[in-house]
Amino acid sequence: MDIYTCLQNDHNEIKDLLDELIKLDERDSYRSVLVEQIKSGLIPHARAEESVFYNAIRAVNSDKSDVMHSYKEHMEAETLLRTLQLKDSTDMDWKETAIKLREALTHHIAEEEGKIFAEARNILSQEEANMMGDAFEKLKAKVGQEGFLKTSFDMVVNLMPPRFIDKMRNLQAPQ
């Protein structure tokens, strides 16, 4: 499966989970389960996408502004997700935050599947897109097991200039 299909599948799954969450009654106990499923889908997706897809585009494309904008949108979505987790646990305006997260992700996905995918298709061969899809799925599974602290460090590393990424990753490797 190519990287575009992998990303689109995840996008659809996360949007569906958010839609289901937003439709819930205020007192539905299933809400916390859905919030956890959204987190478990969104965080690994974002880290793997940044590492595999965004960093590949940054490495070969001289105009990095669209990809850097996408990183910013990931940070905004994760801030909303953490706010949603807090509001869910305290029963405070969680639905309003879920709607904001859904809107932010809908905007991000539209830009990514439009502008970013178009850029990538001009850069990547189909074989490379297939290889990136495999790498994305493997990394996503690994990230899903590592927790928030490790993935927060990965977000910072992914924002480094491409030539420094490996050096930064070596800083966190066990000695």
Predicted features and spans:
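Small-residue-biased structural context
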Residues: 1-175
